[in-house]
């Protein structure tokens, strides 16, 4: 399985970079996982609704340009469906079983995802009702992808 994690902005925090690198290394036994960073749109601290939409739209164009046509897209969205780790694992396994070998997870910037990205997505998921920084979400996602492969294969890790 080829998994892309498309995310807005450059990751600067060393502890997050190290954590993500560790899980990417572990994932090499299960899938080819790549992280694709698209530039975030510079914006002032306080934005009107129209300005927020404009920022998300510009970031959305950059995101969509990175998604190949034959890719199953899963957007991480606050209003997405919440799943347990077991459900997430089963869904990833079903994608592989039914020939969806290319999967892209999309993590928006600090303002979220544009409507165009949400429309392009095949599904939207949420990791809970808490708001997490989009940078931290990368680490949470790669850990859950790793956990999913371990669950599917019945390997120890998941408790």
Swiss-Prot record:
It comes from the Bacteria. InterPro entries: Alpha/beta_knot_MTases, RlmH-like, tRNA_m1G_MTases_N. It catalyses: pseudouridine(1915) in 23S rRNA + S-adenosyl-L-methionine = N(3)-methylpseudouridine(1915) in 23S rRNA + S-adenosyl-L-homocysteine + H(+). Specifically methylates the pseudouridine at position 1915 (m3Psi1915) in 23S rRNA. S-adenosyl-L-methionine binds at residues 76, 108, 127-132. Homodimer. One of its GO terms (molecular function) is rRNA (pseudouridine-N3-)-methyltransferase activity. Its EC number is 2.1.1.177. The keyword rRNA processing applies. The keyword Cytoplasm applies. Belongs to the RNA methyltransferase RlmH family. GO terms for cellular component: cytoplasm. This is Ribosomal RNA large subunit methyltransferase H. Its main location: cytoplasm. It is found in: Cytoplasm. Keywords: Cytoplasm, Methyltransferase, rRNA processing, S-adenosyl-L-methionine, Transferase. PANTHER family: METHYLTRANSFERASE, RIBOSOMAL RNA LARGE SUBUNIT METHYLTRANSFERASE H. Pfam families: SPOUT_MTase (PF02590).
